[in-house]
């Protein structure tokens, strides 16, 4: 059995202000995202933005992630609780963000920013997709430090006893998600993105691979107590929300493949 590192969720005390690791992980993801978007805007001739516009784009994305992620968590996972405790909606440092809600928020942000600049919505998604796993991985580290979203009970040697997870060891599912959604997804997308490839291949890969990684990790993660298993005594809310991403990603990849075979897909 592995030992869960007892890390104080509060990284810094600035007088009465508590700076949480969870928030710092989001700040790291935002800053790293801005840096990489600026770099990509410099080196990609097809980039839909100029390097100096990376800050504005990052602001739109961050707003979409935070608002969409929080609203999505409230609606998808815990609406009755927040209905009776409305002020808790604003306590972001306690955790409670939904990737799928954040994804919807980012799509809305893309639409607004693309309209503002007069650029193609899908080109913007293709441009940003390789950078997204940085933020996903950072968020999962924040979950791990908070000791939340732990996995199912296990007798595996990699099990951990979490402070809020009861006396039995559980899978460190946050680290599984950090590895698949963060490290693996970033590595694959970045390596593909630095080569000549059909347009929108990265966008399709991101949606398909993220949805698949999340679907797999949900088998190790403890279901949300307010829902449990929704279908077949094994399917969770996270898996249900991932299915549309997998399907849409597969459709994009099939279209890219067909257009490539017919020499109708531009390489970028």
From Swiss-Prot:
Q: Give the way it sits in the membrane.
A: Multi-pass membrane protein
Q: Where does a 1,2-diacyl-sn-glycero-3-phospho-(1'-sn-glycerol) bind?
A: 140
GO MF, one example: phosphatidylglycerol-prolipoprotein diacylglyceryl transferase activity
Which GO biological process categories is it annotated with?
lipoprotein biosynthetic process
Q: Which family does it belong to?
A: Belongs to the Lgt family.
Q: Specify the species.
A: Francisella philomiragia subsp. philomiragia (strain ATCC 25017 / CCUG 19701 / FSC 153 / O#319-036)
Instruction: Quote the pathway field.
Output: Protein modification; lipoprotein biosynthesis (diacylglyceryl transfer)
Which EC class is the enzyme in?
transferase
Record PANTHER family: PHOSPHATIDYLGLYCEROL--PROLIPOPROTEIN DIACYLGLYCERYL TRANSFERASE, PROLIPOPROTEIN DIACYLGLYCERYL TRANSFERASE
Cellular component, GO, one term:
plasma membrane
Q: What is its EC number?
A: 2.5.1.145
| Record protein name field | Phosphatidylglycerol--prolipoprotein diacylglyceryl transferase
């Amino acid at each position: 059995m592995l030992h869960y590192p007892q890390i104080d969720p509060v990284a810094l005390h600035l007088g009465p202000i508590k700076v949480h690791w969870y928030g710092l992980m989001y700040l790291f993801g935002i800053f790293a995202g801005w840096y990489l978007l600026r770099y990509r805007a410099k080196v990609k001739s097809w980039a839909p933005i100029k390097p100096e516009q990376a800050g504005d784009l990052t602001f739109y994305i961050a707003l979409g992630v935070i608002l969409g992620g929080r609203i999505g968590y409230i609606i998808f996972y815990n609406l009755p609780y927040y209905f009776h405790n409305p002020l808790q909606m604003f306590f972001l440092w306690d955790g409670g963000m939904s990737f799928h809600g954040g994804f919807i928020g980012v799509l809305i942000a893309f639409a607004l920013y693309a309209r503002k600049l007069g650029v193609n919505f899908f080109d913007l998604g293709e441009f940003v997709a390789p950078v997204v796993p940085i933020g996903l991985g950072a968020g999962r580290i924040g979950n791990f430090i908070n000791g939340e979203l732990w996995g199912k009970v296990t007798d595996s040697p990699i099990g951990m006893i979490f402070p809020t997870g009861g006396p039995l060891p559980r899978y460190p599912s946050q680290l599984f998600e950090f590895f698949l959604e963060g490290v693996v997804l970033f590595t694959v997308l970045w390596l593909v993105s630095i080569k000549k490839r059909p347009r929108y291949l990265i966008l399709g890969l991101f949606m398909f691979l993220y949805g698949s990684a999340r679907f797999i990790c949900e088998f190790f993660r403890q279901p949300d107590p307010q829902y449990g298993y929704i279908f077949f005594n094994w399917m969770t809310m996270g898996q249900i929300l991932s299915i549309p991403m997998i399907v849409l990603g597969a459709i994009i990849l099939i279209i890219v493949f067909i257009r490539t075979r017919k020499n109708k897909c531009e390489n970028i």
